[in-house]
Amino acid sequence: MARMGGKKHLKALVAPKFWPILRKEYKWAVKPSPGPHPIERCFPLLIIVRDILGYAKTAREARKLISEGHFKVDGRVRKNYKYPVGLMDVIEIVDTGETYRVIPVPVKVLGLIEIDKEEAKYKLSRIENKTTVKGGHIQLNLHDGRNVLIKVSDPKNPVEDIYKTLGTLQISIPEQQILNYIPLDEGTLVIISGGRNVGRVGKVVSIHKGIRRHRSIVTIEDKHGNKFQTSLTYVFPIGKEEPLIKLPEGAW
């Protein structure tokens, strides 16, 4: 893929392949604003409104609807048509109450699945890394750009710090309260967020750790008993015994 960073405009021909846009009909595509998701892992809000959900026929119509505040992402109204919407984000159409989640799907990389109002109250966010901040408290840095502070009563014995990198938090939106924690262990139910196995779901059989994260290999078993391997980078925990999010029919 051609370089897309550092420029204000994006040619349609070099836009991410999973964007459902008419590349031969239009020279330019909407370039996402800098935000919680990189360009190769998100949709601009305009593309969701116009090309995926079909609420507008043209970019002008989509921009108007978005600027009027008809769409929420993770519980907050977003009026920027370039806003990047990515993995596990929840989209709500304010006027109709319809809600959708962005999930990994085979071949297309990312897609939307309609969810009910209860499920739309939370999202899953993977812990990418942890840092210790002033006072000895722990800050969890999540895949969607969020930071969650874990307050520690005794920095010398931080019993509150039960969270490990690459585990997943179930958090309320928009309040960002931790509802659940799913560690990445053997037996954890995961979905694959990238690579040739993108969108596949299964339980972790084993984790062979390499020197770096991208060289660590995870063996996973799907519901049919088929085993496959993928990079640790692509493994996203979604539950312990059952998924905490709705999946496409037949995925698990």
Swiss-Prot record:
Keywords: Ribonucleoprotein, Ribosomal protein, RNA-binding, rRNA-binding. Residues 43-105 form the S4 RNA-binding domain. It comes from the Archaea. Coiled coil: none annotated. SUPFAM superfamilies: Alpha-L RNA-binding motif (SSF55174). Signal peptide: none annotated. InterPro entries: Rib_uL2_dom2 (IPR014722), Ribosomal_eS4 (IPR000876), Ribosomal_eS4_central_region (IPR013845), Ribosomal_eS4_central_sf (IPR038237), Ribosomal_eS4_KOW (IPR041982), Ribosomal_eS4_N (IPR013843), S4_RNA-bd (IPR002942), S4_RNA-bd_sf (IPR036986). It holds the Pfam family RS4NT. GO terms for cellular component: cytosolic small ribosomal subunit. GO terms for biological process: translation. GO terms for molecular function: rRNA binding; structural constituent of ribosome. Belongs to the eukaryotic ribosomal protein eS4 family. NCBIfam families: PRK04313.1. This is Small ribosomal subunit protein eS4. It comes from Staphylothermus marinus (strain ATCC 43588 / DSM 3639 / JCM 9404 / F1). The lineage of its organism: Archaea, Thermoproteota, Thermoprotei, Desulfurococcales, Desulfurococcaceae. The gene is rps4e.
